[in-house]
Curated annotation (Swiss-Prot):
Family the entry assigns: Belongs to the TRAFAC class translation factor GTPase superfamily. Classic translation factor GTPase family. IF-2 subfamily.
Residue ranges, annotated region (G1): 445-452
Name listed for the protein in its UniProt record: Translation initiation factor IF-2
Gene Ontology CC annotations of this record: cytoplasm
Sequence ranges of Basic residues compositional bias: 292-301
Low complexity composition bias: residue spans: 99-108, 178-189, 276-287, 318-328
Region feature (G2): 470-474
Biased composition range(s): Basic and acidic residues: 81-94, 112-127, 148-173, 244-255
Chain's gene name: infB
Amino acid sequence: MAIEEKQSRFRISDIARELQVSPREVLQFVKQEGGKVASTSSMVGEEMRDMIFGNFSQEKKLVDETRKIRAEKKKRLTRLEEQSRKAYEKEQQLKESLSSAPSPAPAAHTPEPVKEPFVEIPARHEPAVSPAAPAEQPVIAETPQPESPKEEVVATKAPEAEAKPVEQPEKAAETAVEAQPEAQSQQEPGAEESAEASQTLVQTLPDSMKTYEAPQKIGGLTVLGTIDVSSGSDRKKKSRKKSFKENAAELKDEFEGATSGSSEGGEAGRKKVAKAAGEGESTTGGEDASGKKKKGKKKKKVEVDDKVISKNIKSTISGMDDSGSSGSRQKFRKMRRMERERELEEAEAMREAEKSLIKVTEYASPHELAELMGLTAKDIIQKCFTLGKFVTINQRLDKETIELIAMEFGFDIEFTTEVEATTTEEQVDNPEDMKTRPPVVTIMGHVDHGKTSLLDYIRRSNVVAGESGGITQHIGAYEVTVEGDRQITFLDTPGHEAFTAMRARGAQVTDIVILVVAADDSVMPQTIEAINHSKAAGVPIVVALNKIDKPEANVDKIKTQLSEAGVLVEDWGGEYQCQEISAKKGIGISELMEKVLTEAEVRELKGNYSRDIMASGIIVESELDKGKGVVSTVLVQRGFLKVGDPFVAGNSMGKVRALMDERGKRTDEAGPSTPVRVLGFEDMPQSGDVLTVMESDRDARDLAQKRQIIKREHEFRRSTRVKLDSIARQIKEGLKKELSVIIKADTDGSIQALADGLMKIHNEEVKVQLIHQGVGQITETDVLLAAASDAIIIGFRVRPNVNAKRLAEKEDLDVRFYSVIYHVLEDVEKALEGMLSPELHEESLGSIEIRQVFRVPKVGNVGGAYVLDGKVPRDANVRLLRDGVQIYEGQLDSLKRFKDDVKEVDSGYECGLSLKGYDDIKVGDVVEAYKIVEKKRKL
């Protein structure tokens, strides 16, 4: 417990830092809320912390959004750094490959950089240069300027490239065709001389045309850079210088994103020209061709890496800053990208949350917890040891311990019942199968306010006659046809306080609540409770003010009390419909039904009427019939429940043997909102369980067995824990008295009401221990269990069989029979009061003053005393006071008048006395006489 308290305390300054507000503001708020704090270093509990967060909700929202933005920015910066690192590694690899590459090899790929940039241009001029590769050679000679000596040099150095691949003529032809348009557009009068020079050039290469293709291509490209006579020289020099000396600088500039879109286009154009021109000047004539080939390959690799690096970095920068995007399309793409990233992050966060959320049933073992958390059982046990709990690997842990362990390991716990842990797959409703269904109306209100009388008049039958004391003992479900052949299903709930669970269950399965309030009474606690149940379930309320025919009826008083309870009727400007009725005389009943049907039409109640879907419903009530077995009242919610359907309901299963309405008439099927009595249960289901039709008996049995196993584990753990706790408590505080009880009743709802009522009757010393509960008559097994447990048997509207009655008389057991629940609760309360230890009170009898002390041989000191007040009996308890301080407490050893022993001495008389076991009596001591009186206690 100390650990839990420590973890639930928070410092005010830490809370203020988390909210990013002034600690003094938080301190002032805590003081306004009544918190006992002295400074910003004071600690507050978890409840006060939640109140602080609620008061500073806007600040907390801003802080959470800021943290989220920072987290997203941090993630993007991390991705940018990772991409930059990869780009830097690629650059280093590129430099290493350029420095280690051999000189002859690059020529094989020299034409590729020139091929890619201009591949679209020849498409418009291709018909003019359609001849094959050998015929294209004269065309190449048309492009150069009249610098024929330079072409002679290139031709003479051609033998160095004899080992080149055969496909180079085709590439050279393409390059020549690409260069032709510019050459034709800027052709000068000296072009005829260049044509003659080209003819002489072709004649000097009779046998080595294939090996000459690559140099011829390179030679033509070298001259191609000088086509623009007006301003081509500067561009040529600049492009050559940049491609030769600033390859690394270009890479760095693009890497840093410094170049704009227009400058990138210009640089790209210059790079294309530079590549076409051979990319670099040769320092010596003999190394010109090989140098150009090497530079060409280097530039090819650099260009590919530039594109990848530039694309990655620009996309990252544009994702971080709006200035990086230009145009609506780029902005739209950026927004879509950010949206996808946000969705991915949210999905990842949800997956992480699901990973940290584990669903367990209560009383799981350390081994099961370890499997769910992905840990070892040793880790769980060690954590329990550190928390002060000594457990074994298969020991069942309670709910608090499981929550504490999960919090220590950073997991969220969600507890499920045995039914939720084995839930069947939810079937999807087809909109075409959804049709209007009859409303389910629950009648609620205080006991004796006329709920059953109202239903009695609507059904035009005497329901109350079958109820003991005129009080409804269980939920009744009835289907009624009102005017206009409209169907309404009514649920009649008990009104007295013992049936709180039943009213809550009725509110959960209903569509509309009729709240019956007696006009001659007032709004009672059960009326308020019914209102709260209805509001919690989100069910509309129609108020019925009953007994208006009585002279003492006061409608306005009831409406005032209802408004104070949060139910403001329409007559007073509220939203709740109200109708004044008399259930006995039938006044206002038809108007009440119209309002109920109107409310149902507004809500547009739909039900699945498909015959292909598996039916399901709610167990409203269960009982054990002598000739029929277990009979349950089921309110069908979807589909059609038919005879022969296998089903599972809670921990029980079965097969529908028969269906009957509330009047005992057999039927073959029941649709939505239809109450029906079902025969065929193997075990007694609990009220409120969901009945689900299964595909086969085997599926139903397997599911029911799984639920039964989990339930047995829970019950075993609960009983074991109670015994262990009671042993420790009895050792520490003394024996706690228990009244063991066995309950047998006619219906499951009555058992639940009795159990809830009996559990409320207890205090620190006595309590009711419910040994067993069941539906049906009292049997020999119940009697034997009561004899072994020293328990009493309570039969609620049931009797024992012959053998059980004979055995109970033989064992001298206390078997009691009741038909009204109040009598059970009253008798059990009296029995518990009799088990309570009586209260002890001290009653003063008188006081005696010691005036002289005598020494008597073989007796000791004897005091001569005078009775100041009261009457002192011989057997009274006494205490000796000296100067107001208690010296002795005990009993009188002797009391005498003169020499005679007396039973008592009245006020104003002298006497002699001696104390039992005490001899130090002195003059002036005062002896007080008193007795202990026992007083009966009440719960």
